[in-house]
């Protein structure tokens, strides 16, 4: 099994273009160690790794034939505020009031403590009853972010293998630009210990709100207020109208599962055999720019070809 990557690489590099049914172009430049030619159908794979961090605003063709959804007038309507296991009814009420004041309507609670019939909820949510009435409860964070295209997580801690980090201002600009066309989510952790490592893997960006102290820990409703106000303040920012369509969170998860399954098929083992750590590294890598649908399609094709070639080489 250890010789598969070398064998497979030689097979791909020396495969005649006629077998693929596509035209081929030469690899230019003396720095490329590859022999032979690369089919045009394989070039989008290289494009993923050569793209600038904000490449999703570039003017490029869409090989999948899918078009961008039309922009909406109220991007804040597509912002989903998610609270993971909030323990205080007062915090839930305060967050509802923040959302009412900043024009955000969607509140999702993941496995919250009892709150609907608690007097403290109503006291703190003064004038925001419609936000509480429309609030949705789910059991897991996966359910809460399903259907969105971009997820921002908040934390006050640093750690290895965490996802791509940005300032809260930059993350809100990126989120509101995407919200003009797609649903986005801002995730807040528990009052006591925030988001777990397993929950952070569902986030494309991670932000820490700056503070005057070395170990800041804002109150939950205060953190929501700071992020919600930034979203409100930057809501005029938009993606370019010709930006390629983005993959949803659900499509992103399918890509990750397909890649991990393909690597397992060929006997790939990461450093120290820590597949959970490699899962986080892979997600961080794929999250450096919002994943476009065409990129997801290319990665699925690559994984399907790996399965095909592994069968042909009698690896299974």
Where are these regions (language model features)?
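N-terminal leader/targeting segments
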Residues: 3-6, 17, 62
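Cationic, amphipathic, low-complexity segments that mediate targeting or membrane/lipid association
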Residues: 2-5, 39-42
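Ser/Thr/Pro/Gly-rich low-complexity, intrinsically disordered segments
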Residues: 3, 15, 23, 29-30, ...
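Post-transcriptional modification and biogenesis factors for structured RNAs
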Residues: 11, 15, 33, 40-316
């Amino acid at each position: 099994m250890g010789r598969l990557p070398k064998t497979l690489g030689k097979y791909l590099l020396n495969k005649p273009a006629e077998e693929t049914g596509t035209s081929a172009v030469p690899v230019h430049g003396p720095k490329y160690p590859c022999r032979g030619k690369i089919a045009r159908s394989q070039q989008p794979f290289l494009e993923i790794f050569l793209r600038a961090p904000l490449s999703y605003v570039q003017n490029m063709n869409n090989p999948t034939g899918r078009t961008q959804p039309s922009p909406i007038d109220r991007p804040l309507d597509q912002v989903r505020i998610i609270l993971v296991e909030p323990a205080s009814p007062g915090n839930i009420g305060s967050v509802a009031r923040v959302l009412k004041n900043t024009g955000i309507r969607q509140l999702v609670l993941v496995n919250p403590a009892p709150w609907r019939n608690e007097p403290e909820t109503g006291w703190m949510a003064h004038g925001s009853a419609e936000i509480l009435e429309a609030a949705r409860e789910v059991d897991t964070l996966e359910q809460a972010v399903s259907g969105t295209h971009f997820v921002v997580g908040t934390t006050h801690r640093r750690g290895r293998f965490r996802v791509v980090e940005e300032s809260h201002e930059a993350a809100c600009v990126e989120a509101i630009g995407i919200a003009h066309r797609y649903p986005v989510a801002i995730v807040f952790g528990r009052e006591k210990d925030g988001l777990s490592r397993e929950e952070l893997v569902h986030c494309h960006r991670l932000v820490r709100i700056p503070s005057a102290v070395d170990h800041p820990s804002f109150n939950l409703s205060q953190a929501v207020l700071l992020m919600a106000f930034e979203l409100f303040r930057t809501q005029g920012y938009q993606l370019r109208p010709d930006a390629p369509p983005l993959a949803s969170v659900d499509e992103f998860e399918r890509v990750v599962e397909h890649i991990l399954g393909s690597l397992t098929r060929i006997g790939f083992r990461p450093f120290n055999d820590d597949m959970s750590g490699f899962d986080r590294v892979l997600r961080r890598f794929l999250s450096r720019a919002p994943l476009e649908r065409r990129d997801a399609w290319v990665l699925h094709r690559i994984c399907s070809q790996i399965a095909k070639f592994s069968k042909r080489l009698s690896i299974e």
